[in-house]
Amino acid sequence: MARAKIALIGAGMIGGTLAHIAAREELGDILLFDIAEGTPQGKALDIAEASAVFGKDVSLKGVNDYADIAGADVCIVTAGVPRKPGMSRDDLLGINLKVMKAVGEGIKAHAPNAFVICITNPLDAMVWALQQFSGLPKEKVIGMAGVLDSARFAFFLAEKTGVSVEDIHAWTLGGHGDDMVPMVRHSTVGGLPLPELVKQGWLSQEELDGIVKRTRGGGGEIVALLKTGSAFYAPAESAIAMATSYLKDKKRVLPCATFLTGQYGLDGLYVGVPVVIGAGGAEKVIEFETNDEEKAMFAKSVESVKGLMEACKAIDSALV
């Protein structure tokens, strides 16, 4: 049986970490692409040499030509400029939109049957643009953000309650930004919804509100600490979870930036919602029941995403 071919577009901190995890998990043959000559080749060789230590037979190759990703089953896109202190994700839009155009054209020409996961920020606008530039079916192009945001939410809950992260199920909706919506009523610790934890005294409402606020600013917290870049370990793990569900047809329900066609009362845009990921790509959107407060927060987040889409259209008239 032929092994899957995984193309990692961008050999920066996330790209290199993706290659390392994919190799350890033996997800398939790995192509690490970057326009910077030597960078993908060096990282691929380093990880390949490490495989002799962690005992996995893997194929890794660093490349600088999109032709080398021909026939890729999965493409994970991290290419672009990362955030630095004082920058919002939205500040990256103009630069990274041009990158998405080049990447989309490369995928369209050489890997038109791939399942594409976009990580580049501002995420919701970039995955929308990438789908248009690539021309791939909308269910085969999704964005990684919700898995990461929900993981941060879960970790902060675990840290505060002292409960294993394995027994915490946390969810976020909306765009990947400060207006994201941590779904307090639908998130659980040991099966108990978070409002019930407050009633039982595990958490105070003030503590829960603090966790929600920290979740929304989770990426910025790391940017401020690193000073020279943004998060890469957790984003890479999140994308690998999505790719694994696709390659192994696991049908996992994961929050991702997905193209909506009427779900949540929205149509024609990408935004973070829970979705079943299987061999068909984004196979089914899961719709949470939302109250008036949640609807209002979600609507605010969606408006932020729409604003970024309009900004993209103003830069590139090919986007519709």
Swiss-Prot record:
Coiled coil: none annotated. Catalyzes the reversible oxidation of malate to oxaloacetate. The gene is mdh. Belongs to the LDH/MDH superfamily. MDH type 3 family. Gene3D superfamilies: Lactate dehydrogenase/glycoside hydrolase, family 4, C-terminal (3.90.110.10), NAD(P)-binding Rossmann-like Domain (3.40.50.720). It is an enzyme of class 1 (oxidoreductase). It catalyses: (S)-malate + NAD(+) = oxaloacetate + NADH + H(+). The active site is at H176. GO terms for molecular function: L-lactate dehydrogenase activity; L-malate dehydrogenase (NAD+) activity. Transmembrane segments: none annotated. Keywords: NAD, Oxidoreductase, Tricarboxylic acid cycle. This is Malate dehydrogenase.
